[in-house]
């Protein structure tokens, strides 16, 4: 965004809607608080009394008037509910980051099938982290709604900087449709295609490889480039598993991703007679879904 954010002031001012609200809104917010002042802790507890639903996780509590650190409290505060809180029977409590707060935003799904939840991390510098974005339209939709919510709190001048948006990581996966002999494929990748690969079934179930993309090169081979070209090459990792699943991860744009996908698709088609595991086809077991009961108490007229 175009200005820093006072995370403590803004966090407590952001309205959290009830989970059952059928509209685009903030349904949950989260922050990590650290204080050495008992009065500040009382103020936080007083603010929490005005919230309909909250969860307070105590990470650290020191109250020793005779010690070097006389008083210190670290809290992780969750206000509101999201889909995971309701569907998951056991919600593992995770740690949070300082200098930021997290928002769970509900937006309309562009496919027209109801709503979906987006995870937004807002830092005190004004930087945003939004994982799970699949289209540019979804990103614009999230940013516009966030700015609309922040304007009454921060000021009408707040906006996001349009030319300072970057893709940090793209995760992509596909399945080739047949089971793979990993030992044979590992040898082919390493010695025939000369791609940097590593395979140890005891430590990781898939073949871990690195694809080096060199901009401007018409025929991309994925091999480690010479020393004079290494600074221009992009390193993208891909993993191939026994079941035929392929995972591509790394910092790249969509053109590079499609290039690697076409390379792997062609490789898996051409090497099928050698690496296809026709005999060891294991039918997946049918897993019986165990229904768990979770009790949610709704208290009205507070």
Give names to the regions the model predicted.
Residues 1-302:
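Intrinsically disordered, low-complexity polar/charged tails and linkers
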